């Protein structure tokens, strides 16, 4: 069988208005002092692609409108909801109060794989699954220690090469996809 590229019409994408009204996958991405505007834009675009609930932009993380962010977001900064917090700990506190399970994505002792975290989350009674927050940190320093201490669990992506880490927007894309796919199987989004 030969594959051919899809046209824009073949993709049946939502309009911005339909996206705003669509039921979102209950995943919020928290960016803890992410310095690269391009990384922030890429996370916006990926959150739009998977119809996630939104973003929390914290500390030095840039907010729209921003020309550099727009270069990678390609307009997703206009469709994906976001909230700015000067301090990431305030974002984590607010998410916990709303019933979210908060996961730091970090290279850490006692971390679990995305698959393990998803399995454990999905085993909980539906009433206890209010949503998931995925915390990604600064490109050099990672998730701040005080933020990690507030998280319910830490997720680490297993890596097998010579480098110590992945780019933050690549990591975000991997975990966002994993959670979106798993939660879509659980409920009709």
Q: Language-model segments: what does each one mean?
A:
Residues 1-189:
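Post-transcriptional modification and biogenesis factors for structured RNAs
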């Amino acid at each position: 069988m030969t594959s051919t590229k899809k046209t824009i019409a073949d993709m049946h994408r939502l309009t911005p208005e339909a996206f705003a009204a669509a039921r979102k996958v209950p995943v919020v991405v928290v960016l803890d002092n992410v310095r690269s505007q391009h990384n922030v834009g890429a996370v916006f675009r990926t959150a739009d692609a998977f119809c996630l609930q939104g973003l929390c932009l914290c500390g030095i993380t840039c907010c729209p409108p921003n020309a550099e962010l727009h270069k990678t977001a390609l307009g997703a900064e206009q469709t994906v909801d976001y909230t700015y917090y000067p301090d990431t700990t305030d974002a984590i506190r607010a998410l916990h109060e709303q019933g979210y399970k908060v996961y730091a994505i970090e290279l850490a002792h006692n971390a679990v794989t995305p698959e393990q975290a998803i399995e454990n989350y999905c085993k909980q009674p539906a009433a206890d699954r209010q949503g998931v927050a995925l915390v990604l940190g600064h490109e050099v320093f990672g998730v701040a220690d005080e933020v990690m201490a507030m998280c319910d669990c830490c997720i680490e992506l297993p890596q097998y090469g010579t480098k110590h880490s992945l780019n933050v927007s690549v990591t975000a894309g991997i975990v966002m996809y994993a959670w979106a796919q798993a939660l879509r199987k659980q409920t009709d989004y």
